[in-house]
Amino acid sequence: MVKSIRYWLQALSLTDEKRGEKGKRYQELSEDFGKILFENDKYFEDLGTLYLLHYKLVSNKDLATTWNLFFNSIKATEMTKHHMEEGVKQLILNIDPQYEISERSLSDDCNCLVKTYFAEKNDLKNPEDNMICPFSDLGLIKKEHIRGKDEIIYKTVPERNKLDKLIVLYVIMDNLGDKQSTTIKNLIEDENNIGSVFNLDKNTINYYIDILRDEGYLRVNRTAGLNTIYPTDLAVNILDKYYSRL
């Protein structure tokens, strides 16, 4: 249990592993993320916090490989469970052709991923459902049972009134790093950017960019169809600004 908790704390970027006296390992809240969430929403009650945790999980390729590949590299928006497993398997083999994949572990990982985002009707009867399906309110995955056929898994675009513009801006700025600008194309196609992480299509991305531009966080140059995006001086300390409104 302790190892499992430690794993998820690191996979969600909430803690960094340190070594103390005699090399003993311990967990410390991450400076720019874990501490901010602990100070502002330690029980993860805010929907924006859950979107942030989802982003950190999906962008952690080392500790959450299945999540990373599913959201970033599988481009299909609907698939059977079998096709999902085969897609993840092939992507892993593309990275390391010699890697020995356990079919059981792969199936368990894919089941865990779907379960994280989609609550079955029977699960909803359990008041502790959020512990089973912590990201079910994000609206990123749904599942449909068709009689006589395999169940279908869908990647879905979250409702605009759920995914806050400042959460979107945080992910944009986190991906921007030291660069001075980005493009709509980058936001749509780049690994770990808002298009892949939140299943956002071009229209929805433009919706958020227009709002962030109108509120002064971004400057957009649409000359010659380049759609280049520049952050303004307001686009700093995004998490502090987000949580100050709660």
Model-derived segments and their meaning:
Residues 1-246:
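Donor-sugar nucleotide-binding helix/loop cap in glycosyltransferases
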